[in-house]
A protein has these predicted regions:
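Alpha-helical transmembrane segments of integral membrane proteins, especially early/N-terminal helices
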Residues: 27-35, 86-93, 162-176
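Cytoplasmic juxtamembrane interface segments
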Residues: 135-153
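Aromatic-anchored transmembrane helix interface
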Residues: 63-77, 95-109, 116-140, 160
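Hydrophobic alpha-helical membrane-embedded or membrane-associated segments
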Residues: 2-4, 38, 42-46, 100, ...
């Protein structure tokens, strides 16, 4: 709501930086105080951030790359705290597949630093690391499976409805039906 109001009030340029910062702050708060809500919030960010970017770009002009799109990976990477907290016991608790994946991603990142640009390596790291961290976070907290399952089902039900309605509206109003 704040993002939409800020966009229509003409503060789109300011929201380009405030949206990722605000999302990160809310993500930290939820991670520490309400871990189950953090999971839903993270998914909702992945669902609606492209729409938020479109609204901001509509008001303030298109910008590529857009800092708005950093919000979901930044909030997802908060799960790195789970990795550092459980790293000493990860191997003995069945975390070997995750540790192998993390090792592979960091190996690829180091190769990209040597063979190509730093920016390209960081972008690839930003693509590969958040899903691994999120998966590790979920696997370490398996004891909360029932609560996570309920939250994920509710999040995805509403996410499918909202994104489906938006996709249908966009298809019908942009003239794509005439193609």
């Amino acid at each position: 709501i704040i993002t939409a109001l800020g966009t229509f009030a003409g503060a789109g340029s300011l929201l380009r930086l405030l949206f990722p910062a605000g999302a990160f702050a809310v993500g930290l708060l939820l991670y520490f105080r309400y871990p189950i809500l953090y999971i839903g919030f993270t998914w909702w960010l992945w669902f609606i951030t492209p729409l938020v970017r479109r609204l901001i770009d509509y008001q303030s002009g298109w910008q590529d790359p857009s800092p708005v799109l950093l919000a979901p990976p930044l909030v997802t990477m908060i799960c790195g705290l789970t990795l550092f907290r459980h790293l000493p016991t990860a191997y003995s608790r069945g975390g070997l597949p995750f540790l192998m994946c993390f090792t592979s991603v960091f190996y690829g990142f180091m190769l990209s630093l040597v063979k190509s640009s730093v920016a390209g390596g960081l972008l690839a790291l930003l693509d590969w690391l958040p899903p691994l961290l999120f998966g590790f976070h979920l696997s370490v907290n398996w004891r909360q499976y029932l609560a996570y399952r309920q939250n994920l089902q509710r999040t995805f039900l509403w996410g499918v409805l909202v994104m489906g309605a938006y996709g249908l509206w966009q298809y019908l109003t942009t003239g794509a039906a005439a193609d």
